[in-house]
Amino acid sequence: MLMPKRTKYRKMMKGRNRGYANRGTEFTFGDFALKATEAGRINSRQIEAARIALTRFVKRQGKTWIRVFPDKPLTKKPLETRMGKGKGAVEEWVMNIKPGRIIYEMAGVNEEMARQALTLAMHKLPFKTKFVTRESQNEIY
């Protein structure tokens, strides 16, 4: 599972996920991509589940790039614990996703196969996404 090797601080404040993505919105590696159309939070398990779904569909042809990395710790207190006594332990690692962010890129397969593979990955993610090509990337959301 994806997580940072080490961090400066163990725990982080929740924060708010507002606005649109201003980085990670354009193609870097591949010809086809999965782009977020709404805000959400993705954890390392969801990233891995979607990656497995799309690589199995294309039978490991071509190449896939994961353009997101969960670097934000999410904490949780144990069940049936009274309030207070500090912040809970780190439960999982997440990344805030804003609309317009590219999550996966693919190359080395034809468009129809990439569309089907990325649609399978799309169903594993907790927010709405859409399939984009290098030609159609200028359409915003």
Curated annotation (Swiss-Prot):
Keywords from UniProt, A to Z, are: Ribonucleoprotein, Ribosomal protein, RNA-binding, rRNA-binding, tRNA-binding
GO BP term (any one)? translation
Q: Which InterPro entries match?
A: Ribosomal_uL16 (IPR047873), Ribosomal_uL16_bact-type (IPR000114), Ribosomal_uL16_CS (IPR020798), Ribosomal_uL16_dom (IPR016180), Ribosomal_uL16_sf (IPR036920)
Q: Which PROSITE patterns match?
A: RIBOSOMAL_L16_2
Record text on subunit structure and interactions: Part of the 50S ribosomal subunit.
Gene3D superfamilies, per the entry:
Ribosomal protein L10e/L16
What the protein does comes down to: Binds 23S rRNA and is also seen to make contacts with the A and possibly P site tRNAs.
Membership in a protein family: Belongs to the universal ribosomal protein uL16 family.
Q: Which NCBIfam families match?
A: rplP_bact (TIGR01164)
How is this protein named in the record? Answer: Large ribosomal subunit protein uL16
Q: Which gene encodes it?
A: rplP
Q: Does the keyword RNA-binding apply?
A: yes
Protein species of origin: Campylobacter lari (strain RM2100 / D67 / ATCC BAA-1060)
In Pfam terms, one family for this protein is: Ribosomal_L16
Q: Which domain of life is it from?
A: Bacteria
